[in-house]
Amino acid sequence: MPGGRRTAGARARGEVMLLSMSRTQFQDVLRRHPELANAMVGVLSSRLDNTNAQTFRDLTEKNRQLQTAYDELKAAQEQLIEKERLEKELQVAAEIQMSILPDVLPSPDGYDFGGRILPARQVGGDFYDVFDLGNGKMGVLIGDVSDKGVPSAIFMARAHALIIAEADNSTSPGAVLRMVNEHITRLEKSTQFVTALYGVLDLLTGEFSYARAGHEPPLLIGERGDVHRLPHEPGMALGLWEDMLLDENSIRLAKGSLLVMFTDGMTDCRDPNGVPFGLERIKETMKELRSLPAQAACDRLFSTLMDYQNGAKQDDDVTLLAIHAK
């Protein structure tokens, strides 16, 4: 039936016989043989069922693909929202930290101070301060709060404020830190703690009295250029227990000496191979800093540390605070 209407087509591969009948003849055959009509309906129904089943499978698969795409898009949106929330939280923490740090360090006669801080991933946990206590004395403070984020930044702000407030009530560094520890352990409900070193510098005599609450012992460049750690005993961080143990001591800063205080982010900073900077490298670098003012010494130490780090990931804040006796 070239060019005619058809429901199917076939191509013979050999000699065949073809039966041709009109619609009227075909309908007459079906009337005389209804079983043939039933068979044809059965074949067509089976083909329709198979077609419907395949269509259902195709639709089911497309729905599954659409659901997967929707779930992935939803997860990506949630990750983006969480990322934006964390970035905002980190920014708030950094702003709290920067608001605590002094804009300008004092420069009393005979001494100069220097400080540097490099937060890890915009998160603030370290702090430092130098403030006038009156009567020819200066308060010197450096600390490191456990953990990171906004809660730690708030905890840091409270600890800093408590130390400043108690420093007005006592010239004894140990008494100040004990009172602060009492406030923190009784009033704070968090599990955070803070290591700290608080000292009082007598500008007239050069005596530096200090108390160390679990913090890194300072390093001193003496009159002859030798570098050594200050004498130290065991001490505990603020906020751990009400009955705490402090390391208390005092030294005299002779003219030309340089005292450097730092947080453990300095010693723990690692190069691309994972090797920490360590205390000995700080000492070696400090041997070249004897004649420098405090701020220049801090800058040089930071520069040496960054060269050593060489782009490796920074896991903790790095903070320096220095006193130079002119």
Where in this protein do the model-derived segments appear?
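Cyclic-nucleotide recognition modules
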Residues: 1-42, 49
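Regulatory loop-to-helix N-cap segments in sensory/regulatory domains
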Residues: 2, 19-20, 25-33, 148, ...
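Short beta-strand segments in beta-sandwich/barrel cores
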Residues: 17-18, 216-219, 266-267
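Short amphipathic alpha-helical signal-transduction/dimerization elements
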Residues: 18, 34, 38-52, 160-168, ...
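Short, charged, low-complexity patches
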Residues: 30-37, 41, 45-48, 152, ...
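Amphipathic alpha-helical coiled-coil "transmission" helices that mediate dimerization
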Residues: 39-42, 46-88
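… and, occasionally, acidic/histidine-rich disordered N-termini of signaling adaptors
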Residues: 74-260, 312-326
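C-terminal catalytic subdomain
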Residues: 177, 197, 249-261, 266-326
